[in-house]
Amino acid sequence: VAIRGYNSLFVEGEGDDRNYGTPLYVIDGVPMQSFTSPVTGSNTLSDLDPSMIESIEVLKDAASAAIYGSRAGNGVILITTKKGQAGKARFSANFSYSASWLPAAPDQWGGNYERRYHLEALYNTLAPYKTADGTWKLPESYEEVYENRQDKGPMYNWFWGTTRPQNAIALQDSLNSFYNNSTHWWKQNYQVAKVLNANLQASGGNENVRYMIGAGYYDEEGIAVNTGFTRFNVLTNLTAMPAKKLRMDGQFSLTYSDRSRGSNAGSNASKMESITSDPTDTPTLLPGGGEVGRMMLQQLNETSEKNQSYSARFNLVLDYEIIRNLHLKLSAGVDFNQQNQNIFKPKALDPTYHFSTSEGTIARDISLINENLLSYNFSIKNRHNFDVLLGLSFQKDQSFNNKGSGSNGPNDHVHYVGAQGWGGDNGLNNVGDGTKDLFISAFTYLSNFDEERLNSYFGRVTYNFKEKYMLEATLRRDGSSVFGENVRWATFPSVALGWAFSEEPFMKRFYWLSFAKIRGSWGVSGQKFHQPYLAHGLLSPDRYTFHGNAGMLPNTSAGVINKNLSWEETNQYDVGLDISLLDYRFKVNLDYYYRYTKGQLNRITLPGNTQYLNFQWQNGMAISNQGIELELIADIFRETAVQWRMKFNLSRNWNRFEKSADGFDFNSQIIGRPLHQLMVFKTDGFYNSMDEVPKYYTANKEVQLIYDNDTRMVLFNVD
């Protein structure tokens, strides 16, 4: 999800130490952990049941998101779940079942047709040779080939010159039914997808206690073989008034999900792509070659893969009214996620040693959040209206994972590794041929633990005069353990102004104008990187010991310590216009924004020739986004039994790569140009003969051709 353009130079998959531009998700007032698990491949957002969501609000401008400070650099999405209403108990149930399939599989020649056209391609394939004057020439006869034999000589007919005689035998044997069979690989890898979705909800209560309980079940069989997603979730919302001035809100949710990825779907997807990219490499004739020859279907159907996720979210809020309009709100929340993975591959998938393998991973993430708010609103002469908020919050995040693997299991029915591992003495198996011993480790294990903390102090003052002139100022101070020793704290201010000019006396004559307001805002928000120890440097155990203790060495993969590695900072400016017409039946919202994000993380190569610590992570890059947003809303039928609301929105964003650490272009990003451009070669037809191919002469007066293929490429900046 990208709010108002690309907010990061990077995308997921480029390492956990960068910002991917993902917004902050807040569920019922509690920030949630939003990430794609490297274990199961599932995103934590998949734990949410859409049927239990009451509303979704997107905070796009800096003023509205500033209260979240260092986590709001990519925008904020507020999700509110359904709550109970006072009155009689209400029950609702929903059930749906659907199916989907590929509209059409790519056409493929098969069997005898493929054999015939493959032969024709071989017969018409030629290879050039280099003449005495240094040019290249295609042979025109077998005699010319014979007279000009070279190390990588010419070829007049690729069929007779092929070095793969087994293919020639298969392609010539038109009477052998084995070579006339046809396999449609796409149909072997895809299926009809089925989706079952069901949920049940109950709500009700009275003025003192209100409740909502919901349960959902979702089961999807993917369109690719051996893929799918299953989820079971329970949500409970409770609101109670145990005392006259005390209100309690509690929420508890529990989710279990299981995702099947088709034996690491990414690798198999690339294999499917290769089938159509080069049909001659993966033929439909049996036996298949290329990726099919590497047992693609066996990996899909015989590999056992379990990707299970467990999540629990709990939040408790106590709101006490000390005096009239003065509220103290205390909240505590827990966000827990655990992902379990087990992958088992049978012996048949190991063509070298015929070992079965089992891999297991457990990853656990927990976030503890405490927030304390003091709010007070008052009016002076019913004209000057104030709303003051003070708060402080504390957050602690922990991440733990362990991973193990084993090989050479007793049989294909045992999918897990015991405490002693698999195999022979000391967990090792001798699979040598007698002349050279080869040992395969039967048991491996690794573990990891991360922790980070965030402390915040913030305040907000809102003022309006007769609901006509509005001013809001926010200030937040955040401190995080992940940043360098010198820059752990940062300040994030914002200011917003508004003028409801429709309330002015001179606008009353425009009876059709229900409401109109001009607004503007400026604010600073931040974003942290994902690796909690990137600024502090890492140590790794050494193989040598001193007095029985293992030594420690700097971890070269983490770079040099940077005590000034700090927040990614975004300055944003917004100007907007809101208009409502004809008793609020038609609404128009128009916005312009400009965002400048600096201090993005970059790996900087250090001067010198130090072998191990030759780079450092620094805040070195900047990008910008600007754009316009238009939203039109029309309530066609508003006060009838059948209601009809129409919405139309339009947006346009322009982004630029503004700055790199060294002042030069960064990889494919060009300073002053949009991010993530698609760049292709510009062509100008085809070469009709070798005489048209550009050439140059070396110092030895040899002719060298600038030739890659038959397509004529247009060269730029060749000087």
Enumerate the predicted regions with their spans.
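Short, glycine-/polar-rich solvent-exposed loops and beta-turns at beta-strand/coil boundaries
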Residues: 1, 16-18, 69-73, 227-230, ...
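Residues embedded in well-ordered regular secondary structure
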Residues: 1-2, 9-23, 32-41, 85-225, ...
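Extracytoplasmic beta-strand/coil segments of soluble accessory domains associated
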Residues: 1-30, 55, 65-82
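Flexible glycine-/small-residue-rich
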Residues: 3-7, 27-28, 60, 81-83, ...
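A beta-strand signature from Gram-negative outer-membrane beta-barrel systems
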Residues: 50-92, 195-197, 210, 218
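A generic beta-sheet turn/junction motif
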Residues: 72, 204-208, 217, 465, ...
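Flexible glycine-rich, low-complexity coil/linker segments exposed to the extracellular/periplasmic environment
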Residues: 118-184, 276-298, 415-448, 543-558, ...
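Extracellular/periplasmic, surface-exposed regions of secreted and cell-surface proteins
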Residues: 231, 237-246, 251-256, 265, ...
